[in-house]
Amino acid sequence: MSNVTSSKATPSSGKAPEQAKVENIRGVFSTQEIRRVGTGTTTRKTVQKTFWFIDQQPDGSIESQPLNANYVPTGAKRKISMEDLINKFAPEPEFYLNSVYPKMQELQRTIESGDEHREKGETFAAEYEYTTALKVDEDNVRANFGIGLTYLQRGESDKAEDIFQRLVKLDAAFEQEHKHLFNDFGISLRKNKMLKQAVEYYGRALELTENDENLHMNMARALMEIKDYEQCTQHLIKGLELNPEHEPTLRFLSWLQQKSLVPADQQDAVSALLKAYAPQETQTATDGQADG
């Protein structure tokens, strides 16, 4: 497997061969930085080599991620240009094939094994697999979510708190590709009555993605459980500003109004929104609504 690959379709009887197809770039590259160490006559030059996992996305953008000491990509991803890739990065196909790719595959299998055990309720086996994965990549988002959900499944709030503190510092935890795990973790925090953490969790997500009505809805749920009705209502209003036809938010807001939980200074705004957008037979129950 090379860093840049191209392939031609094999000609078959009566068919012309397809044009050469260049696949997206995916592999390991390196950069070198020359540093001067010492002063005066003792000055010497050293070359520092850094390895990066490069992954070109379907839209053509290129993401780079550093490798850790265990030869797996870890930490924050950053975008680079094709010009920078060509001018500043050197391909390392043998290192990728012989060292990095096998480690990435092994890590993937370990996490998948942890997921399988967790889904079966085998929490101690799941914990072992996730712990093994985190020894290889302590910032792995899936492994951190997995072990956090495992602790919450067992009701071990103290251990879950440690994982929570790690997750809220990882920007990657709030990316679209981890949305399902993100939602599961938020729900589990609330079910385990870790409400302060749930509010901080959704607040961190909103710092990175403000324009998501589902996030505002989930934040409102957590705020309602700690009886902060003013902020709860405010997030529901913000959610409707983003999507006036979001039915779960309309139902939630209608329920708050019927229970006389909407603060006085927000009642006019809520009444106007419900009059404008809520269906005539608005459901009043918030229980059982799926988190987005």
For each feature predicted by the language model, list its residue ranges.
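Structural signature of tandem alpha-helical TPR/SEL1-like repeats
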Residues: 121-128, 154-166, 192-204, 226-238, ...
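Terminal, low-structured helical/coil segments at or just beyond the last alpha-helical repeat
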Residues: 233, 237-292
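Generic detector of contiguous secondary-structure segments
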Residues: 11-16, 138-156, 236-238
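Alpha-helical adaptor scaffolds
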Residues: 142-221, 225
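Structural marker of alpha-solenoid helical repeat scaffolds
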Residues: 136, 170-174, 208, 242, ...
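Long, contiguous interaction/recruitment modules in multidomain scaffold/adaptor proteins
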Residues: 2-132, 136, 159-162
